[in-house]
Amino acid sequence: MSHTPKSAGSSHAPVNSQTALVIGAIGVVFGDIGTSPLYTLKEAFSPHYGLTPDHDTVLGILSLVFWALMLVVTLKYVTAIMRADNDGEGGIMALTALAQRTLPGGSRSMYVVGILGIFGASLFFGDGVITPAISVLSAVEGLEVAAPKLEPFVVPITLVVLSMLFLAQRFGTERVGKAFGPITLLWFFALGAIGVYNMARAPEVLHALNPWWGVRFFAQHNWHAVFVLGAVVLAVTGGEALYADMGHFGAKAIRRSWQFVVLPMLTLTYLGQGALVLRNPAAVSNPFYEAVPEWALYPMIVLATAATVIASQALITGAYSVASQAMQLGYIPRMHIRHTSHSTIGQIYVPAVNWCLLALVAVAVIGFGDSASLATAYGVSVTGTMLITTVLMIIYARANPRVPAPLLWLFALVFLAVDCAFFYANIIKFLDGAWFPLLLGLILFTLMRTWRRGRKLLHDEIRKDGIKLDTFLPGLMLAPPVRVPGTAVFLTADPMVVPHALMHNLKHNKVLHERNVFLTVETLQVPYAAAGKRLKIDAIGDEFYRVHVRFGFMETPDVPLALMRSCDQGGIYFDPMDTTYFASRETIVASANRGMPIWRDKLFALMHRNAAPATGFFRIPGNRLVELGAQVEI
């Protein structure tokens, strides 16, 4: 995903800029929800739910789909949740930070909100595995309609398409990304045209817009109707992307895209599929492709495959973005991040995330085999994330004096009921496939919690055994070691304690540099650090300095650049060719008698050993770096 400056999404942006943002948003934000028509109605009438495609049932399902789009996407996300932005950024991590700000620091409620945010992000990655698999598989399954003899080749073709997609990530998407918007726009207009084509033959399908048919469906099917919501929710998968990508395109462009293009075209295509089923109930086997005129079938398969690849690309890029934020906020180990664009901020490639996603997507395609089986696994991660988002929004809005209490209660009652119903409808499919994304989410949640807890234990252990800087320096200056020319920068997590690297340097080299800097890097709970608050320099005597550098969680930390700019703010001048960076690299020793169970200690030690060095993460040049080892028991 490319990062668009916030001003681009403002009401004062030029018309051409707004149009470009709208088209860009259609290509990136709405790819997931735009490919849902490939499988939603097909899944609703699958044998799994035992529904007969008669007149009342078809209108009932269509009514539920339409009003799910209106309630969940239009009212919840577009109208309400997109108002909660963290300096223009959206997404579950940003909302977690907003909700935590309304709570007392260090309180149990703040801790619980953090846990909710981590679990929501974990479910997002589970969604990131299922979405490419089900989307591309559904598109390629059109070959079964066009040429049934090609059925055995559907899975291999899907794997080839997905492999090419993931292999191409390392080259970036800046060039081809410009075509995403127009292609997806063409896709939506094709959906609308096919919908109108079929509606003209059964205009009575328009009755489904009346919510009475949805209510009637519940009255006729009782609790079984709740079970069917597991298929209806497939129509709103991708709704979370509207909020997550708000910082890239601006709320205005996303709202316009939804109101004037995406919602109308989705409504037309679902009604068109319903009209076809009313005329030909046998078409429920694959209502999307059965609704396409025979002459347009192969072009539609190609367009659908392109649309699903674009939807998958948007989600993959989103996974990189969330991973980068999680690294910055200290929830997962540092990984190598490669910037794939010289001109566009936010175009990144994270190899570890890419290859993990490819392996898991391939497992999903091979293990489930078809889109119908994958659909049973799909909804639980999406609905879990939607439910957590609602809870976080309620916590945040509760502290906002501009939100009237009756309105907040209404929001809470309506959307907690809707989200809980959708989540329940999917969680009861646990043995049918819902276990897969939940297992992925649980594994990632465990990794994130272990890393977070392990880092705290490591920090506490270093601080416990450390020497206070304020008492160490006066003693050192009583018998000062030999001073050598240049500047030494010691990276430390705790600015009040003597860094291990300094102790080792004195012990083995017996020298001090002319100027010594104790550098602490902090990631803020906002996307971008304010220019005036990025750097703080305290002189503590005898050419020793305590420097605090702050970055937002959406920024790429560049420590040398931040230090070089210090003189612009009246600070000291750093000559990059005269500066040596010192860092300690801890070796973790697991202990059964400390803070975590031994298996989590060993897991943390493994993660720590394989994490990318902080020096590379902070853009510190290798030829100016000295790393010194230290063994720490946790």
Curated annotation (Swiss-Prot):
Signal peptide: none annotated. The keyword Membrane applies. The keyword Metal-binding does not apply. Keywords: Cell inner membrane, Cell membrane, Ion transport, Membrane, Potassium, Potassium transport, Symport, Transmembrane, Transmembrane helix, Transport. GO terms for molecular function: potassium ion transmembrane transporter activity; symporter activity. GO terms for cellular component: plasma membrane. Pfam families: K_trans, K_trans_C. It is found in: Cell inner membrane. The chain crosses the membrane at residues 21-41, 58-78, 110-130, 147-167, 179-199, 223-243, 258-278, 296-316, 348-368, 377-397, 403-423, 427-447. It is a multi-pass membrane protein. It comes from the Bacteria. It catalyses: K(+)(in) + H(+)(in) = K(+)(out) + H(+)(out). HAMAP family: Kup. Belongs to the HAK/KUP transporter (TC 2.A.72) family. This is Probable potassium transport system protein Kup. It comes from Xanthomonas axonopodis pv. citri (strain 306).
